Curated annotation (Swiss-Prot):
Expressed by the venom duct. This is Conotoxin PIVF. Probable neurotoxin with ion channel inhibitor activity. In vivo, elicits dose-dependently excitatory activity upon injection into fish. Its action is slowly reversible. Keywords: Amidation, Disulfide bond, Ion channel impairing toxin, Neurotoxin, Secreted, Toxin. Disulfide bonds join 2-10, 3-15, 13-19. Belongs to the conotoxin A superfamily. The cysteine framework is IV (CC-C-C-C-C). It is found in: Secreted. The keyword Disulfide bond applies. Its main location: secreted. One of its GO terms (cellular component) is extracellular region.
Amino acid sequence: DCCGVKLEMCHPCLCDNSCKKSGK
């Protein structure tokens, strides 16, 4: 799990804009 989304969706796993847009 990465920032609320699966690792596959958030490769960087930095909880940044990309992660927040895909997850929470």
